[in-house]
Amino acid sequence: SEMCIRDSLRTAVLATQVSKDAFKALEEESDYSSNVEQARILQTDRQSLAEKLSKEAETLSQEEIGDIQRSIQEKSKDLEFIVNKIQTKQNETADKVFRDLNPSVQKILQELIAAKEVKLLLGRENILFSDQALDLTDDVTSMLDVALKDQNSDN
């Protein structure tokens, strides 16, 4: 259940304006955007080859079919490599946002736990009881947005 709480916090943090801005900045990075574009092109090319193969299979020679299949495999491998690069950058961005906002998250969690009188019964390994009706994700997101807006206007 600790994983569930961590996932909820991550979801809350990633829904903040700060996070949205960080991902917008990522999308504007030339390396990242060219990787996304390259992935799009590879996906389209691969799709076209697959369609050609299915439409023209009867008229193509075995050699042509083999060439197309190899080309599809190459494009799939390239696509997988680029998608991994894209996902790595997205994960790095998310991790950085999460690290940067963690002090604010902890403070807000303490306030929410006090305000909502959250009580958890903890076992050695897991949460034995928790109020399922108590999902703090949206509260954390909106409180973070407010807190961070206040911080920025103080600077």
State where each predicted segment sits.
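Long, charge-rich amphipathic alpha-helical coiled-coil "stalk/tentacle" segments
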Residues: 23-107, 115, 154
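Short, charged, intrinsically disordered terminal tails
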Residues: 145-155
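Short acidic, Gly/Ser-rich segments with clustered Asp/Glu that frequently serve as metal-coordination loops
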Residues: 10-16
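Extended, charged amphipathic interaction segments
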Residues: 108-137
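Residues immediately flanking
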Residues: 9-10, 124
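Short, small-residue-biased leader/transition segments that mark boundaries at the very start
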Residues: 3-4
